[in-house]
Amino acid sequence: MVTTLQLTRPDDWHLHLRDGKMLTDIVPATGRRFARAIIMPNLRPPITTTTQALAYRKRILAAQPKNLDFEPLMTLYLTDNTIPEEITRARDSGHIYAVKLYPAGATTNADFGVTCLHKLYPVLEALQQQQLPLLIHGEVTDPAVDIFDRERVFIESHLIPLLHDFPALRVVLEHITTQEAVDFIEAAPPNIAATITPHHLLFNRNALLAGGIQPHYYCLPVLKREIHRQALVAAATSGNPKFFLGTDSAPHAKTAKETACGCAGIYSSHAALELYAEAFEEASALEKLEAFASFHGPDFYGLPRNQDTVTLIKTPWQVPESLPYGDDALIPLRGGTTVAWRLAE
């Protein structure tokens, strides 16, 4: 039985850090586990320009403890008003690695998102020319579409036509949740990839809905049926380089989750790598974790793999029931329960 795992230090290719005084509560947990992270731009107001992204980067670095060497990889928030020249500025900055597409209203702070992709074709052409990846929250927001079908319908109605018009566009379909998304990525050319979260590997929609509403398991895209969870596990453990780690760790105050209309988002940075190890161990595929966590992401982004390592030890520990979050608290994924793997300090 494996009791110790030494891995090339991984990166998180989908992370929410928030802003302001919450940064000092959130950044350290990621920096202890990951060397780099793609930082989501859906602040309020969103990060829509290179100037804003570089300023946000400075705030993140200022919140980092002195003993950590964590690099935030910045992104821009695509809006109906984004111009091609901004894409050039982003690429030339040396610190912006992608542009994020949120369909308007699809998730937290997506009010400024895109309402019509066709109006942004000049921007998408610039992204294709600059080879700057487009990161996509792949769900439709049509109220007539069942929430459990929004990812599948987005792929069929929007993503396939988009890639027909921009075949060389580098795309990451973020936080995939369905068998249909797995099938699409597997059949797609090498410029198309996907991230997978720990919570979508470990849980199906029973965690959210069975035995009473569990607001701390509410995220977007929502947890799906067990058949879809199994498809995600098979993809993550397959060794296919198109699938890589992206936690989508998204902290919200406890009071914003435990309410009549709670926010979508699951916070997992406190134990992200440990939770991935648990999922891979359950699938008898621990030997595949390093490639998924440490190799596939940088290879897709054209970045060097990290040179240092992290070590996980098979020592159960109890996740705190809550963690500090500004003037409030947040409930971490698996709060108050035991996780099988521990990060060696």
UniProtKB/Swiss-Prot annotation:
The pathway it acts in is: Pyrimidine metabolism; UMP biosynthesis via de novo pathway; (S)-dihydroorotate from bicarbonate: step 3/3
Residues annotated for Zn(2+) 1 binding in this entry: 14, 16, 100, 248
Residue positions, PTM N6-carboxylysine: 100
Catalytic activity reported: (S)-dihydroorotate + H2O = N-carbamoyl-L-aspartate + H(+)
Q: Where is the active site?
A: 248
Instruction: Write down any Gene Ontology CC term.
Output: cytosol
EC number(s) stated in the UniProt entry for this protein: 3.5.2.3
Instruction: Give the note describing cofactor binding and stoichiometry.
Output: Binds 2 Zn(2+) ions per subunit.
Record-annotated residues binding Zn(2+) 2?
100, 137, 175
Q: Which cofactor does it need?
A: Zn(2+)
Q: Does the keyword Hydrolase apply?
A: yes
State the superkingdom: Bacteria
Assembly information from the UniProt record: Homodimer.
Which PANTHER family does the entry mention? DIHYDROOROTASE
Q: What does this protein do?
A: Catalyzes the reversible cyclization of carbamoyl aspartate to dihydroorotate.
Q: What is this protein called?
A: Dihydroorotase
Originating species: Nitrosococcus oceani (strain ATCC 19707 / BCRC 17464 / JCM 30415 / NCIMB 11848 / C-107)
Q: Which gene encodes it?
A: pyrC
